[in-house]
């Protein structure tokens, strides 16, 4: 790019979306400065995927869109412009070798999230992007015509620019710098904001089973949430009991649907401990177990059916006398046990807060953003990317892909 087309661009936020936007803008020939409030870049990247960084998901795009929870249509342009394969190619060609694991989740071969940040930082360095750390942005500078003219830092410094990209994140994992300040700045200038809520987050329960079963993981179970008779979520996988309630991959995914439709409401959830068996099949299996243990007490005959930690809870909930001999357990009591195993109901009272949430649901309403360019419809010359937007997806590398895609589109669209 030559002459008058070369612009001074400021990118606010050194996370996934901001770094990708800075790279795309610099590759387009612009003079780019990236401002990051923290002492290092990519602070949140370091903790994603338990420190391994789930870079993206390698599934086909049709399946990819089914994993987006909020505003998938808004994301068509950005994802088709810069899809998961493009992201994988970027990292592979910039010194970060990747591998695909279960569920098409993509990780660095090294299992170190730091390699992801290093690839981005090295690329920015090669392209001449100026990086300014410890620099928090507190306001925008607007020109007389209402278009963006730069930013004002927390130290009162005015940084003039032709274009500004905002990629300041949501509210989750606040210690990484995601405090929602960028969203509040945009609200001040007229952007509509969808209510921000913690998502991909553990549940708190009314019952005390969490404390009693703390640390117990249940694998290959079915978990569902109902709002009256309507199922809000129904999924299969692994969950975990914690001191406050439940967590684990299955619960974390379910939370995004709960937060979207039922946030703050007390609702019933159900665990099917044996989803591969119908009630009839399960009853036959229990009969067989009972036949083999007919002279044992009920409390001593369940070790093949449940993990040892779960047995006292199941006995209590079944309301069968633990001292009772197996051959004295009635058909009605057995049916009660079958129903409990297939439909163990618990009460969700709410979610944990932003400090434990993987992402933020809500943010800058997408109606105020051009999906083909990521430019603000409210402030010309301002572009938005990443988690500060009202976009979110399930776990598995999908949310980082949204950051890469929207960041890249913002960076190539500066005009």
Language-model features, listed with the residues they occupy:
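N-terminal Rossmann-like FAD-binding beta1-loop-alpha1 element of flavoenzymes
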Residues: 8-34, 410-414
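Glycine-rich FAD pyrophosphate-binding loop
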Residues: 26-50
